[in-house]
Amino acid sequence: MCIRDRDLPEVIDLRRDLLPEPAGDHYIAGSLLETQWMDDLRKKHPEGEFVIVIEGVLMYFYEKQVRQLLTRLADRFSGGEVWFDVCGPMMANSKYIKPDSLRGHEAQIRSGLKDGHEVENWEPRLQLIDQALYQRFFPKRWGFGGRLMGLFPDICRKSSSLLGYKIK
């Protein structure tokens, strides 16, 4: 198994300064929206089965960019899976509700998604495996309010979730 960590060049440089690349891991500097890294991976592993995990990124892209990225992944990684987290519309459209990581920062959430099946309409080669709700993971972390919210899945989806797709 090979792990590839992709991030912006300045983040990869900082990561290399702080954490040397572990054996079997590889850092790739550049934009997630570029296609060269996808083509390089496919060329290097023509028979590879890929699980692509995109964490904490897509909500900062516009919906058009997310759609384009997912189409490009489907073009190149048939048979694999793609997993990513999304903010729901309640968080994406609110000026007042922000994840803790954004408080005090100017970064903006630019897209949100409530129903994971919507992505299947954007890109028919993606088949929803799961739409997992964060409030169901690590209940102690969320406290009483989070556990209570976890009893109402529709509200949770308006906040955030983790989506997984099989690439056909």
Regions found by a protein language model. Give the residues of each.
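Short, small-residue-biased leader/transition segments that mark boundaries at the very start
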Residues: M1-I3
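Alpha-helical subdomain
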Residues: R6-K168
